[in-house]
């Protein structure tokens, strides 16, 4: 039996959908990716909670997290306006700076679209079968009428939480350190989500070159826990 899931104007329903879609248990395989953090830990660039917090906040403010938020916002707008999503999908894929970053965003994007079909929506017919993760999240959120600012804040928080989970497995910090970082990052996530909501494609760009290099170096790391 197919259940038609309508666009929501109810804040509680929107919140519930975001919590489901961006939950660590949503089947996108995010637990298997470290976004280059594993290599940064291996090379001694991130050794404690303070360094981890700094690493994450710059990824969000000026790195891949920021670019993904801009792409997510543009995909949301295209979905809301009924515009074509293939161009933004192609751009998002092209912006993946290394083989593992490409794998990370494309596999998660495809898995997200497959799982999100439990909430039927016409947006799935307008998306390419292979789609980068931020485009998938933004388009589905827009297709369901989830408010943009909320979608971006949840997306960025999920990005950080996944890397915080990875940091525990990498013995950078423990659960108490992770919760402290989560609390400390709230202003960063809120401010970045607000900026991304007002962004355009001209705002794409990052300056976290070391993080990008770590993602590349991870490809040849002999012993590792994560796929990226």
Curated annotation (Swiss-Prot):
Protein name per the record: Urease accessory protein UreF 1
What is the first-listed, main subcellular location in coarse terms?
cytoplasm
GO CC terms: cytoplasm
Q: Which domain of life is it from?
A: Bacteria
Can you tell me which family this protein belongs to?
Answer: Belongs to the UreF family.
Keyword Iron-sulfur tagged: no
Tell me, how does this one assemble? UreD, UreF and UreG form a complex that acts as a GTP-hydrolysis-dependent molecular chaperone, activating the urease apoprotein by helping to assemble the nickel containing metallocenter of UreC. The UreE protein probably delivers the nickel.
As recorded in Swiss-Prot or TrEMBL, the protein's gene is named: ureF1
Write out the annotated subcellular location.
Cytoplasm
Gene Ontology molecular function terms on file: nickel cation binding
Where is coiled-coil annotated? none
Q: Report keywords, A-Z.
A: Chaperone, Cytoplasm, Nickel insertion, Virulence
Function summary: Required for maturation of urease via the functional incorporation of the urease nickel metallocenter. Disrupting the ure1 operon causes loss of urease activity, decreased resistance to low pH killing in vitro and decreased pathogen survival when inoculated in BALB/c mice by gavage.
């Amino acid at each position: 039996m197919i259940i038609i899931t309508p666009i929501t104007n109810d804040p509680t329903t929107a919140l519930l959908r975001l919590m489901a879609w961006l939950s660590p248990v949503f089947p996108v395989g995010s637990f298997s990716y470290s976004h280059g953090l594993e290599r940064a830990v291996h090379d001694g660039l991130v050794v404690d909670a303070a360094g981890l917090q700094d690493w994450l906040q710059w990824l969000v403010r000026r790195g891949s997290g920021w670019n993904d938020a801009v792409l997510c916002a543009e995909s949301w707008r295209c979905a809301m306006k009924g515009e074509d999503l293939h161009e933004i999908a192609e751009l998002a894929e092209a912006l993946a700076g290394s083989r593992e970053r490409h794998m990370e965003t494309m596999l998660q994007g495809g898995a997200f679209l497959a799982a999100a079909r439990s909430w039927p929506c016409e947006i799935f017919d307008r998306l390419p079968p292979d789609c980068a993760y931020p485009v998938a999240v933004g388009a589905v959120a827009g297709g369901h009428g989830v408010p943009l600012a909320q979608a971006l804040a949840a997306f960025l928080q999920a990005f950080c939480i996944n890397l915080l989970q990875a940091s525990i497995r990498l013995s950078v910090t423990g659960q108490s350190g992770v919760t402290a970082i989560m609390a400390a990052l709230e202003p960063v996530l809120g401010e970045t989500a607000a900026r991304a909501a007002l962004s355009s494609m001209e705002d794409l760009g990052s300056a976290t070159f070391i993080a990008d290099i770590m993602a590349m170096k991870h490809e040849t790391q002999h012993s590792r826990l994560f796929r990226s």
